[in-house]
């Protein structure tokens, strides 16, 4: 049974423990999930309120043309030049990943993915009958990519693609121009697909340039871009994403899956299209807030004895190393056995973002999607939890 092979979500699998803690009256600081708490653009919410239809019909399988045309102008601002026909609207970025895998890969084909990686990539590869081959990045090196030779060690006659997330979930790493050119050269040399998840492009904090896979010359037919409005506009619940590619054969294959699932969400597209008119100050305010939260979290983590976090360059996550024997045991313990003044923290055990056995055993992914006051308090609670945890691996309490 294929479902038995599907990995549990490291982000959501502890939800029953959290629910039980809340029943006991414990307040939980949710650092486990990338659900922004910042407001959805008013123009999107107003469009939702204005919906006045007598029938909520199917939308076109490719998505509304008006929305796709408007998206071309959005992408052009980032130097991504596409036409409306290059864009397929999906039910969230997750469906875009799944349809890309199902369209481009045969059972037994392999995808090279830097790890740690977003856990659902593994799940969708299993759904497609494909195999993830991971290439290790390390917290000590800030999760930068290894040299090209390490990639080539993994390439064989079943290798069909490389998958990246840029800026990265779960690490917050931003690929450099050198790294993107390295990936381009591999894609060109071995005629691979490049699946590029770029849903966090708005959130780059270092002044470094955003290098999209669509900027890479010579592999235009190999690139499949994955996008979503979920994190950009705090619209996770409307489930609107996009798959973008210049490759007509890939689009033709993807459309067969789109037609089989009938249509992307009608109401979600209305909200997402309207949200493209959000004023520039909306983006600035959201960006500035994440800059402050990032500093609050990373400074606070690195002040806790035994804890280390690199400085994430983008997105709104970090992977931190904790002085614990097993991060999943620690996260479970925080929810089931610990509280400090009636409060505790919920984090995502990082081992679930790796496929290499034993990797990430003492790491957690933390999302800085809470206001600074809550992040500051969550750091106090985390420090107290580490001081009390019986499986702590150092004596510096």
Predicted regions located by residue number:
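PLP-dependent class I/II
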Residues: 4-8, 14, 21-27, 33-51, ...
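Conserved N-terminal alpha-helix of the aminotransferase class I/II PLP-enzyme fold
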Residues: 58-91
């Amino acid at each position: 049974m294929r479902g038995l092979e599907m990995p549990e979500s490291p982000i959501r699998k502890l939800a029953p423990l959290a629910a039980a803690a809340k029943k006991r009256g414990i307040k939980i600081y949710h650092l486990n999930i990338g659900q922004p708490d910042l407001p959805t653009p008013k123009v999107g919410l107003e469009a939702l309120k204005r919906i006045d239809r007598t029938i909520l019909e199917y939308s076109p399988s490719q998505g509304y043309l008006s929305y796709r045309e408007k998206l071309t102008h959005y992408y052009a601002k980032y130097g991504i030049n596409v036409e409306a026909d290059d864009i397929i609207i999906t039910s969230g970025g997750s469906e875009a990943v799944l349809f890309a895998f199902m369209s481009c890969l045969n059972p037994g084909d392999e995808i090279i993915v830097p790890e740690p990686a977003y856990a659902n990539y593994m799940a969708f590869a299993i759904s497609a009958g494909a195999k993830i081959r991971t290439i290790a990045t390390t917290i000590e090196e800030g999760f930068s990519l290894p040299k090209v030779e390490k990639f080539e060690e993994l390439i064989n006659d079943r290798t069909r693609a490389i998958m990246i997330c840029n800026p990265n979930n779960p690490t917050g790493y931003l690929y450099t121009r050198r790294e993107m050119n390295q990936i381009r050269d591999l894609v060109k040399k071995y005629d691979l697909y490049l699946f590029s998840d770029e849903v966090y492009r708005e959130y780059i904090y270092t002044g470094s340039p955003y290098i999209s896979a669509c900027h890479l010359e010579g592999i235009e037919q190999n690139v499949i871009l994955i996008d979503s409005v979920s994190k950009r506009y705090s619209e996770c619940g409307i489930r609107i994403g996009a798959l973008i590619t210049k490759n007509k054969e890939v689009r033709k294959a993807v459309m067969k899956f789109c037609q089989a699932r009938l249509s992307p969400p009608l109401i979600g597209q209305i909200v997402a299209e309207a949200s493209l008119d959000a004023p520039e100050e909306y983006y600035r305010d959201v960006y500035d807030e994440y800059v402050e939260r990032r500093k609050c979290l990373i400074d606070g983590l690195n002040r806790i004895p035994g804890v280390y976090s690199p400085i994430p360059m983008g997105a709104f996550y970090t992977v931190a190393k904790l002085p614990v024997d097993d991060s999943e045991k620690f996260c479970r313990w925080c929810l089931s056995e610990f509280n400090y003044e009636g409060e505790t923290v919920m984090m995502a055990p990082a081992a679930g973002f790796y496929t290499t056995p034993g990797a990430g055993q003492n790491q957690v992914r933390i999302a800085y999607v809470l206001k600074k006051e809550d992040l500051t308090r969550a750091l106090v609670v985390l420090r107290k939890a580490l001081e009390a945890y019986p499986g702590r691996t150092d004596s510096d309490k």
